[in-house]
Amino acid sequence: MRILVVGAGAVGGYFGGRLLEAGRDVTFLVRPRRAAELAKNGLIIRSPLGDFHRPSPPVVSREDLAEPFDLVLLSCKAYDLDGAMDSFAKAVGESTAILPLLNGMRHLDVLAGRFGPKPLLGGQCVISATLGGDGAIVHFNDMHALSFGELDGSRSKRIETIASELVGTAGFDARLSDEIRQEMWEKWVFIASAAGITSLMRSSVGAYVAAGASDLAAGLLDECAGIAAGEGFQPREAALARARAVLTAAGSPLKASMLRDIEGGKPVEGDQILGDLLRRAAKPDDRSLLRIATLHVRAYEAQRTLGETSAKR
């Protein structure tokens, strides 16, 4: 199976690198700067679960992409999706499967609008990693899980073939799911709650718990779960219990990646994670925590845009 990994950042680089390590036929679609970095230093993974280095990994540029692949693994930020689709369009053929690992659910509609629904799979991952200053992928803990499946829950021939490439021997915890839409919704509920409350409080979980805001975190989780239920995907009790425990854990250093991006002055996936969920609410409440968190992040984005505009004058 020929696998195209779109980008070689923290997520795509990690999972693609582990697939390379396991002997899979992997090519990275990268921009010229990242291509030069990989040619010079190789693909480097530093992880508690084992380091990996592949000198001169297989790469291709958008301009040189000439034929379809069997599987496209997509892990870009949601705000980069349009450009990413343009870059890998020539890799999508009649039998190509696209496995996106983006946050939220809106990307499924965007991808289907471009390529049709046939190629699309559902997918999600759990990993904490970043790209170091030297271009190495730094993995922080022992979590490196990826679940995937047909969006209708079927066990198609193609999903079984993909599972044979990924499950058990790919160098990370891969799992074929018959309920991938449910799992994607449960993850969205959690990350929206975590992003919303840590960004709103501008603090780690432990800090806002110490300040007495545990009830706000729990309330935001309940609100997000209610929206999911209204869409037909009531989060299961076990998923809610795990999320509640994480979001109310005393002393926890956890910050959502959205807050880390805000602290770094970077772009954020505010509309994809928070705004889209808010729009799906049956009866939006002007004083809802989700609305307040969404507007808080929008204000950051507006201020960031104003700052960039002023800097160009």
Give the predicted meaning of each segment:
Residues V30, L49, E63, L102, ...:
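Residues at the C-termini of beta-strands that transition into short coil/loop
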Residues K90-A91, G113-L121, D134-A238:
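Internal alpha-helical scaffold of NAD(P)-dependent oxidoreductase catalytic cores
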Residues M1-D51:
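NAD(P)+-binding Rossmann beta1-loop-alpha1 motif at the extreme N-terminus of oxidoreductases
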Residues A218-R313:
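NAD(P)-dependent Rossmann-like dehydrogenase/reductase catalytic/cofactor-binding core
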